[in-house]
C-alpha cells in the first residue's frame, strides 16, 4: 500500500444521515474549520437502469434515487493530507461517517455543486437544491 502525502487546503466529502450522530453539525463545528454543507441531496436521480438497486434505492413514482446524503466543502487552515482530514472527521462523527474524501481543485465549482448549480450538474440536468438550505460553519 502506497501512502499519498499530497497536501491541500480544500477538500470535499459525502456523509450519509444514517452514518452520523444526530448532533453532527455541532460535532463538525467543534473542529473550528470553515465548512459549507449542502442541503440534503434526496432527489439525485439514478438515470442508468443498470445502477438501480430495488433493495437500497429510494424509489418514488417509479424513479430511482441515490441514497440521501450531504456534500461537505471543507477548508483546512494549513495544507494537510487527505488521510489527516479523514481521521479528523472520523474522530468527530464516528468511524463509519466518511469513506471518500477528495482534494478540491475549484472551491467555486465545488460550492456550486452543493446545490447542483455547477456547470457539470446543470449539463446533467440534476435536481437543483435551494441555496438558502446551505449550512455554513465557522465563518465559511
What function would you assign to each model-found segment?
Residues 12-14, 36-90, 102, 114:
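Histidine-centered divalent-metal-coordination microenvironment in nucleic-acid enzymes
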Residues 27-36:
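Short secondary-structure junctions
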Residues 1-11, 16-25, 85-140:
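Catalytic "initiation/cleavage/transfer" segments centered on a nucleophilic residue
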Residues 4-7, 30, 65-66:
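Flexible, charged surface loops at secondary-structure boundaries
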Amino acid at each position: 500500500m502506497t501512502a499519498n502525502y499530497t497536501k491541500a487546503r480544500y477538500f470535499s466529502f459525502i456523509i450519509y444521515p444514517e452514518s452520523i450522530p444526530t448532533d453532527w453539525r455541532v460535532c463538525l463545528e467543534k473542529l473550528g474549520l470553515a465548512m459549507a454543507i449542502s442541503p440534503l441531496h434526496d432527489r439525485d436521480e439514478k438515470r442508468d437502469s443498470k445502477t438501480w438497486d430495488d433493495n437500497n434505492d429510494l424509489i418514488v413514482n417509479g424513479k430511482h434515487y441515490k441514497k440521501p446524503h450531504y456534500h461537505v466543502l471543507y477548508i483546512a487552515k494549513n495544507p494537510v493530507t487527505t488521510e489527516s482530514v479523514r481521521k479528523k472527521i472520523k474522530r468527530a462523527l464516528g468511524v463509519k461517517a466518511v469513506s471518500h474524501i477528495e482534494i478540491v481543485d475549484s472551491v467555486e465549482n465545488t460550492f456550486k455543486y452543493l446545490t447542483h448549480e455547477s456547470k457539470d450538474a446543470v449539463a446533467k440536468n440534476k435536481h437543483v437544491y435551494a441555496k438558502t438550505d446551505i449550512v455554513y460553519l465557522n465563518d465559511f
